């Protein structure tokens, strides 16, 4: 058992295979005082597999300021983990304002690296990846998505976008529509 420095630990979680988590991440999850996560029900699958029982706070874009206020009394005197449902926290996930709040208060923040769907997709793409741009999720509005596609066409580097599984076909059709020239 190692005593953790008080502050915020941004811990990457597995993308699909629960065994893809580092020993360091497991050790820190075992030792933190509580865990901030997107979906407690989802996070419990991983935590139960690891035999970890901790208090969970749910964090979303719409409640981030509320969570920041709820944990103010713990900042600086607790070790707190932030995890996402899958992959690296803050990569198209909530948590930016939380991290900024810790940094602005000069409270320790560190990243525990691990799975990243952005990096995995780049590695498997067969495209040059020494220079790339990540755009996050495709905008919901078709006009905004079309603008993004046009912007990507103008770039001469590999680009990564997130598209929810149910929307891939529609997005590919939009790419074809915007690529006729």
What are these regions (language model features)?
Residues 15-18, 85-89, 165-167:
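Short glycine-rich anion-binding loops that position phosphate/pyrophosphate groups of nucleotides
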Residues 68-76:
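Short amphipathic alpha-helix with an adjacent loop that forms part of the alpha/beta core around
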Residues 57-65, 137-142:
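Conserved helicase motor
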Residues 41-43, 117, 167:
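Alpha-helix capping/helix-boundary segments
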Residues 2-6, 119-181:
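Beta-strand/loop-alpha-helix module characteristic of Rossmann-like adenine-cofactor folds
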Residues 29-35, 107-109, 158-159:
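Short active-site oxyanion
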Residues 76-135:
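Short glycine-cluster motifs
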């Amino acid at each position: 058992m190692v005593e953790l420095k008080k502050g915020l630990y941004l811990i990457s979680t597995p993308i699909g295979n629960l065994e893809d988590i580092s020993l360091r991440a497991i050790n820190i999850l075992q030792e933190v005082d509580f865990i901030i996560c997107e979906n407690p029900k989802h996070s419990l699958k991983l935590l139960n597999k690891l035999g970890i029982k901790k208090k969970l706070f749910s964090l979303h874009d719409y409640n981030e300021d509320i969570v920041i206020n709820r944990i103010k009394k713990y900042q600086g005197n607790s070790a707190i983990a932030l995890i996402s449902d899958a992959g690296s926290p803050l990569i198209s996930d909530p948590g930016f304002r939380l991290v900024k709040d810790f940094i602005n208060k000069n409270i320790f923040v560190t990243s525990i690296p691990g799975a990243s769907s952005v990096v995995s997709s780049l590695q498997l793409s067969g495209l040059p990846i020494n220079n790339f741009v990540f755009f996050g999720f495709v905008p919901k509005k078709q006009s905004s998505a079309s603008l993004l596609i046009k912007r990507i066409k103008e770039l001469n580097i590999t680009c990564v976008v997130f598209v929810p599984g149910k929307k891939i076909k529609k997005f590919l059709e939009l790419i074809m529509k915007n690529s006729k020239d």
